[in-house]
């Protein structure tokens, strides 16, 4: 499937809701994601390549290859840097559950 740009960056679905799956798996290339949250979806980010930072509510986390981050539903989050990420979304349907809330300030 051809990648496209979403709130988090360039997305390439690997397993989708339309496949009948209970969860979705996406490959993301993130440079500067928009601040957002999900009402019904938990996410697990596995950093494959690159470095950056992630804002989880009011906490900033350094991102590097091999790191796994759990983002529960309801947590405002965004990432920035030069990142290649595998994201597992539970349950499936995350693209219908994205609620953008604007651009926050962040440290470099």
Model-derived features: positions:
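Acidic/histidine-enriched, glycine/proline-rich intrinsically disordered or flexible terminal extensions
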Residues: 95-108
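Short hydrophobic/aromatic patches on the structural cores and recognition surfaces of FHA
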Residues: 50, 66, 85
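Glycine- and acidic-residue-biased ligand/ion/polar-headgroup-sensing regions
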Residues: 32, 40-43, 47-52, 57
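Short glycine/proline-enriched turns and hinge-like loops at secondary-structure junctions
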Residues: 38-40, 81-82
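A short glycine-rich, His/Asp/Glu-containing loop-to-beta-strand
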Residues: 2-35, 41, 88
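Short acidic-glycine-tyrosine-enriched beta hairpin
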Residues: 58-74
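Ligand-binding loop in jelly-roll beta-barrel domains
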Residues: 73-98
């Amino acid at each position: 499937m051809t990648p496209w740009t979403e709130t988090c960056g360039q997305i390439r679905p690997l397993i989708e809701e339309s496949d009948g799956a209970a969860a979705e798996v996406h490959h993301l290339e993130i440079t500067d994601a928009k601040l957002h949250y999900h009402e019904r979806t938990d996410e697990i980010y596995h950093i494959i390549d690159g470095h950056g930072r992630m804002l989880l509510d009011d906490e900033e986390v350094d991102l590097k290859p091999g790191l796994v981050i759990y983002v529960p539903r309801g947590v405002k989050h965004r990432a920035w840097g030069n990142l290649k990420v595998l994201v597992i979304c539970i349950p499936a349907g995350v693209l219908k559950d994205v609620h953008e809330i604007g651009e926050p300030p962040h440290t470099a």
